[in-house]
Amino acid sequence: MNKRVLLVIFFVTLLIADEVNSFSFFRKAKGFLKKIWKSKIARRLREKGMKALKNYANDVINGPAEAPAAAAAPEEPPVEQRRRRR
């Protein structure tokens, strides 16, 4: 999955949990949503979201990680250009 998608899913789940806890209308659904929140899938999504958030924050603070020079393709020697006669 894309990092942005994981971040969006992470924040949406946090917002849903906050809204459920703040409204008394959802008291009956609160237990069901707690089960969903504690499920394995939700935990994995939160973990991935936290990792993506930490990586994004590190990229913003330190700049993007550069690829090592050995992995880069070797540069070709410059091609000599012929002079045009005017």
Curated annotation (Swiss-Prot):
Disulfide cysteine pairs (residue numbers): none
GO process annotations (BP): regulation of blood pressure
Annotated GO MF terms: peptidase inhibitor activity; toxin activity
Domain of life: Eukaryota
Position of the signal peptide: 1-22
Tissue: Expressed by the venom gland.
A GO CC annotation given for this chain: extracellular region
Disordered: annotated span: 67-86
Localization per Swiss-Prot or TrEMBL: Secreted
Keywords of the record: Cleavage on pair of basic residues, Hypotensive agent, Metalloenzyme inhibitor, Metalloprotease inhibitor, Protease inhibitor, Secreted, Signal, Toxin
Family: Belongs to the non-disulfide-bridged peptide (NDBP) superfamily. Long chain multifunctional peptide (group 2) family.
Role played: Inhibits angiotensin-converting enzyme (ACE), but does not serve as substrate for the enzyme. Potentiates bradykinin (BK) on the isolated guinea pig ileum as well as the isolated rat uterus for contraction. Also potentiates in vivo the depressor effect of BK on arterial blood pressure in the normotensive anesthetized rat.
Protein name, per record: Bradykinin-potentiating peptide 25.12
Organism: Lychas mucronatus (Chinese swimming scorpion)
